[in-house]
Amino acid sequence: MANFTDAASLQQFDELLKNNSKSLTVVHFHAPWAPQCSQMNDVMAELAKEHKHTMFVKLEAEAVPEVSEKYEITSVPTFLFFKGGEKIDRLDGAHAPELTNKVQRLGSGGGGAVGAGDVPKEDLNQRLKRLINAAPCMLFMKGSPQEPRCGFSRQIIQILKDHNVQYSSFDILSDEEVRQGLKTYSNWPTYPQVYVSGELIGGLDIVKELVESGELENTFPKTVSLENRLKSLINKSPVMLFMKGNKEAAKCGFSRQILEIMNNTGVEYDTFDILEDEEVRQGLKTYSNWPTFPQLYVKGDLIGGLDIVKELLEGGELVSVLKGEN
């Protein structure tokens, strides 16, 4: 597709912004080792088919550091939105509904006249169907989970939180077409509206009834708390190394050094690539009160980072520590 391309250098990036200054340009800062980036590239490809007047660009964050540093890209996937060569918005993380909404909203206001070769605006029913299927559980509400903008939305957010329900949300106040269209599409006149697997569950009253009857647990997808997830990960193997990259390909010098040391001990260990999961990356810093990576754990207990491992190696204690003898 002419409007879905790659930028492999600073020069290419600048040229793409210059050549598409009259329309919206969406840049996906990605990494080939991150599965969520691959998923979002698929979303971008679909959006490119529907929004021919918008330019969609993939840029490998680590391959073009000049651009990544300029725009303070610290994790992938990250999306930047440009018009007239200037950044106008940003989206961090793999959030397909939010990306779709931003492309629709930011792209609709400009880009010059629509030419004869451009595709007509996406059919509303198709768009609504795609939105309600964007996640296993979708909540259409006023505002966001962080800032609900009506009492009913605030109540339903609290219920979902209390029952550890995993969901994505869409702010109907940001899109009047979706707000009005969904009422007719689902024959449900009020908000919030909750969907599971593309099927309407109902609004606040229905969700409250599910709570009272004890059926809510079996209706909604559950989420695991971050703390429980971290506990599970650090105990996944007797020796766990949280690093940038994996055994086959370390993605920073510190991780590469600790891999060499670990491989020379002959002790079996497992690894977790923190670059693939920002929630784990940030959560582990707080959970273990250790701000840097790599981090080494034995039987669920933090041993430390590269410096500690080097000290244990020099003191002749590393192998016994890894075997849980100390």
Curated annotation (Swiss-Prot):
Pfam families: Glutaredoxin, Thioredoxin. [2Fe-2S] cluster binds at residues 150, 252. It is found in: Cytoplasm, Cytosol. Disruption phenotype: Morpholino knockdown in embryos reducing the levels of grx3 protein to 40% severely impairs the synthesis of heme and the maturation of hemoglobin, and results in individuals with fewer red blood cells. Keywords: Cytoplasm, Iron, Iron-sulfur, Metal-binding, Repeat. CDD domains: GRX_PICOT_like, TRX_PICOT. It comes from the Eukaryota. InterPro entries: Glutaredoxin, GRX_PICOT-like, Monothiol_GRX-rel, Thioredoxin-like_sf, Thioredoxin_domain. GO terms for cellular component: cytosol; nucleus. GO terms for molecular function: iron-sulfur cluster binding; metal ion binding. NCBIfam families: Grx4 family monothiol glutaredoxin. The thioredoxin domain lacks the two redox-active cysteines. This strongly suggests that it lacks thioredoxin activity. Homodimer; the homodimer is independent of 2Fe-2S clusters. Heterotrimer; forms a heterotrimeric complex composed by two bola2 molecules and one glrx3 molecule; linked by [2Fe-2S] clusters. Together with bola2, acts as a cytosolic iron-sulfur (Fe-S) cluster assembly factor that facilitates [2Fe-2S] cluster insertion into a subset of cytosolic proteins. Required for hemoglobin maturation. Does not possess any thyoredoxin activity since it lacks the conserved motif that is essential for catalytic activity. PANTHER family: GLUTAREDOXIN FAMILY MEMBER (PTHR10293), GLUTAREDOXIN-3 (PTHR10293:SF73). This is Glutaredoxin 3. It comes from Danio rerio.
